[in-house]
């Protein structure tokens, strides 16, 4: 057996949570492989809206095993709040959610450090979510981190050492803070965490594969936020690309099967950094309003723009995407024309690739297509798609070289249309 991977191809917020929930019935296991509570996966069904930050999106399927892998960073306080909210709505987590002992813990001082570093950067700030993600991964790489497995023995000593080291750094930054409430909630989260199955996830996952179980690996954020391949330094602190599933779960490269790449019919970005197709006019505001484009974790208004095919082709390349999934098609239902960026103009030269030194000065070169101006939210099969929408899909597939297997026409799990069903 091989694992399949589901990941975002843009700057995050593509709708991965909903798609995982839609795909989950065909899998036995859903495993999260990177990131932390800085990204929220939003799911809507049966009139309820859920935002998952650390827990895999397969948790809503009652018979599925869900695994938080070693590549994830976990805040015990936020995890406790998220898990208790799910349990209160009738979902049994403790039997079905397994957590890697090798996952690193976000400490209260990591969150303080995150805020202090951003404050020190002034106008050059990256625009982090303030959840302590960067400082936690920094400690991991510098071999100073505290892991989930550490809570089982000699924990107080390791925590005290990490806290003292962080306080020395904060002293140098001259940043005022109060840990009292953060620490109280954090240690309550630690006790709650002990109630779950803490596992050697790499052994568990490979054992499940050997026993013929099907596994879906769930990524967070998006390819353009990858620490190596994103628009550095305006990126996250982990590998959001397909290779991150190997290092974040302990899966060998030859065990990767299908790679599902998710993108919106337009583009959004939260925080600072280059965004070639960003719109600063009423069209951008209209997309934001119709798409409800506000961060599920921070509540920040997302920057909006037309779909960027240059960036998408780059993401498809570095991930080895085999199947595409287009989200939020319905947001563009009322537009008379739709634009798609097919190249950039940079330093007076036209280029069709995503460059190392991309800046805000990059000018998008667009192709304009007719809009479909049809309400697609109640459509149940591709046979109902308007001619203009089919033309848009064909144009995208020709440009990107990969079939668009799934189209989302609304936020609910039922508003999902599978294409190429003859396969």
Swiss-Prot record:
EC number(s) per entry: 6.3.4.4
Q: Name one GO cellular component term.
A: cytoplasm
Q: What molecular functions are annotated in GO for this chain?
A: adenylosuccinate synthase activity; GTP binding; magnesium ion binding
Q: How is the cofactor bound?
A: Binds 1 Mg(2+) ion per subunit.
User: What cofactors are annotated for this protein?
Assistant: Mg(2+)
Which Pfam families does this entry report, sorted A to Z? Adenylsucc_synt
Q: Which pathway does the UniProt entry assign to this protein?
A: Purine metabolism; AMP biosynthesis via de novo pathway; AMP from IMP: step 1/2
Binding positions (Mg(2+)) = 13, 40
- The entry's GTP-binding residues are 12-18, 40-42, 302, 328-330, 408-410
Q: InterPro entries from the xrefs?
A: Adenylosuccin_syn_GTP-bd, Adenylosuccin_syn_Lys_AS, Adenylosuccinate_synth_dom1, Adenylosuccinate_synth_dom2, Adenylosuccinate_synth_dom3, Adenylosuccinate_synthetase, P-loop_NTPase
**What is the annotated localization of this protein?**
Cytoplasm
What's its catalytic activity?
Answer: IMP + L-aspartate + GTP = N(6)-(1,2-dicarboxyethyl)-AMP + GDP + phosphate + 2 H(+)
Chain sites annotated for binding substrate: 296-302
Query: Which of UniProt's keywords are assigned here?
Result: Cytoplasm, GTP-binding, Ligase, Magnesium, Metal-binding, Nucleotide-binding, Purine biosynthesis
The family line of this record is: Belongs to the adenylosuccinate synthetase family.
Q: Give the multimer and partner information.
A: Homodimer.
State what protein this is by name.
Answer: Adenylosuccinate synthetase
Supply the source organism for this entry: Bacteroides fragilis (strain ATCC 25285 / DSM 2151 / CCUG 4856 / JCM 11019 / LMG 10263 / NCTC 9343 / Onslow / VPI 2553 / EN-2)
Identify the coding gene: purA
């Amino acid at each position: 057996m091989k694992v399949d991977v589901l990941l975002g191809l843009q700057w995050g917020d593509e709708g991965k949570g909903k798609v995982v929930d839609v795909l989950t019935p065909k899998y036995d296991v859903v495993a999260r492989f990177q990131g932390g509570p800085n990204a929220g996966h939003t799911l809507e069904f049966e009139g309820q809206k859920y935002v998952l930050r650390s827990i895999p999106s397969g948790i809503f399927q009652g018979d599925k095993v869900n695994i938080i892998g070693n590549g994830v960073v976990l805040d015990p306080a936020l995890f406790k709040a998220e898990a208790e909210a799910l349990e209160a709505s009738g979902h049994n987590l403790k039997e079905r959610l397994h957590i890697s002992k090798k996952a690193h813990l976000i400490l209260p001082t990591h969150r303080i450090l995150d805020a202090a570093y951003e404050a020190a950067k002034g106008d050059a700030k990256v625009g982090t979510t303030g959840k302590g993600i960067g400082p936690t991964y920094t400690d991991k790489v510098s071999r100073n981190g505290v892991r989930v497995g550490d809570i089982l023995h000699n924990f107080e000593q390791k925590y005290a050492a990490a806290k003292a080291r962080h306080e020395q750094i904060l002293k140098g930054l001259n940043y005022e803070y109060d840990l009292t409430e953060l620490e109280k909630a954090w240690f309550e989260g630690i006790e709650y965490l002990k109630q779950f199955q803490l596992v050697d996830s790499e052994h568990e996952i490979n054992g499940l594969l050997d026993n013929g179980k099907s596994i879906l690996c769930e990524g967070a954020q998006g390819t353009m936020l990858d620490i190596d391949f994103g628009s550095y330094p305006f990126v996250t602190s982990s590998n959001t690309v397909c290779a991150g599933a190997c290092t974040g779960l302990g899966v060998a490269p030859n065990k990767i099967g299908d790679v599902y790449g998710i993108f919106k019919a337009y583009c959004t970005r939260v925080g600072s950094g280059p965004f070639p197709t960003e719109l600063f006019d009423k069209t951008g505001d209209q997309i934001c309003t119709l798409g409800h484009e506000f961060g599920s974790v921070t509540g920040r208004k997302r920057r909006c723009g037309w779909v960027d095919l240059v960036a998408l082709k780059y993401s498809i390349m570095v991930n080895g995407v085999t199947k595409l999934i287009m989200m939020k098609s319905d947001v563009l239902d009322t537009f008379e024309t739709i634009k798609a960026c097919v190249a950039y103009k940079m330093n007076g030269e036209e280029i069709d690739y995503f460059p190392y030194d991309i800046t805000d000065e990059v000018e998008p070169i667009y192709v304009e297509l007719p809009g479909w101006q049809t309400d697609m939210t109640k459509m149940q099969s591709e046979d109902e798609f308007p001619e203009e929408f089919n033309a848009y899909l064909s144009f995208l597939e020709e440009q990107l070289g990969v079939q668009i297997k799934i189209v989302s026409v609304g936020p609910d799990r039922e508003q999902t249309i599978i294409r190429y069903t003859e396969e």
